[in-house]
């Protein structure tokens, strides 16, 4: 199904896959913009961070990348406070930031994903074939690429596909879920299809922009994006939601763009696979 209808590839026919035992979780959260006008990107990533912490992730299993120029910004009337809804919780509370966005290049994200430590990258994903990996990216996008600050073609689908294939060869994950809130994001993640055990959900297809959500007239900024706010609503209500049901709810509630799912045929049955494997999994290493 294409066009204005839901687009999910073969999910109803996908069989079950034989995955290794699930013993741990990792997360990489990235806001790829800075400055007050882009408030929503960092706010959304911090809101996801709070969801993971509440679900039992420890900070050593979350790599958080934001510019951190919002909470104490001169334009912020409530210093030290970042929210995704008017009057909502402070998603900046007790955060542990691993890297400022401006201290990295987009390609550093690939090294972090692939566990490549260096003097400039002391903290990386150290996952194994028994770990599920959740990646959430929020920022700007252009056709065929995701932006890094003001660099428009900073991260392409080929860039991600190359490192994902290497991660698969090295058995650096059990399952990987990557969600992208960016304009034209579908065109990037579509290039990553064909890799076993990975699922990609994007806020928009490859030909359209994604949409902001919740405008704060006093602060003169958008506080969130529609895709992310819907995602947070869904996992707050039910952290065990099936992937197919999550996609359906994202699709019907994300007005103005078409939420897309890619690589379902290489992931498994989306009716039985669910978010608890990424957002609500309890074990001795991440709780």
PLM region spans:
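Short, small-residue-biased leader/transition segments that mark boundaries at the very start
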Residues: 1-8
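Cysteine endopeptidase catalytic domains of the caspase/legumain-like
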Residues: 9-287
């Amino acid at each position: 199904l294409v066009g204005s209808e839901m687009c999910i590839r073969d999910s109803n026919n996908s069989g079950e896959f034989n995955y290794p035992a699930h013993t741990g979780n990792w997360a990489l959260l990235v806001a790829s913009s800075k400055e007050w006008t882009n408030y929503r990107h960092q706010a959304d990533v911090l809101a996801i961070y709070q969801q993971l912490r509440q679900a039992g992730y420890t900070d050593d299993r979350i790599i958080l990348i934001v510019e951190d120029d919002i909470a104490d910004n001169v334009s912020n009337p409530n210093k030290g406070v970042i929210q995704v809804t008017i009057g909502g919780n402070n998603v900046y509370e007790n955060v542990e930031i691993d890297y400022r966005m401006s201290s990295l290049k987009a390609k550093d994200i690939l090294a972090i994903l692939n566990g490549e430590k260096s003097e400039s990258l002391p903290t990386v994903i150290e996952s194994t074939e028994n770990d599920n990996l959740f990646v959430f990216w929020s920022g700007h996008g252009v056709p065929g690429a995701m932006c890094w600050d003001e660099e428009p073609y900073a991260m392409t689908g080929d860039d991600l596909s190359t490192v994902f294939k290497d991660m698969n060869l090295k058995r650096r994950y059990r399952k990987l879920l990557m969600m992208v809130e960016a304009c034209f994001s579908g065109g990037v993640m579509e290039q990553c299809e064909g890799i076993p055990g990975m699922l990609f959900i994007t806020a928009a297809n490859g030909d359209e922009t994604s949409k902001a959500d919740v405008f704060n007239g006093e602060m003169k900024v958008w506080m969130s994006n529609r895709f992310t706010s819907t995602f947070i609503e869904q996992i707050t209500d039910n952290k065990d939601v099936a992937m197919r049901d999550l996609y359906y709810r994202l699709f019907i509630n994300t007005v103005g763009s078409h939420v897309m799912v890619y690589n379902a045929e290489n992931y498994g049955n989306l009716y039985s696979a669910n978010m608890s494997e990424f957002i609500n999994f309890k074990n001795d290493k991440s709780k």
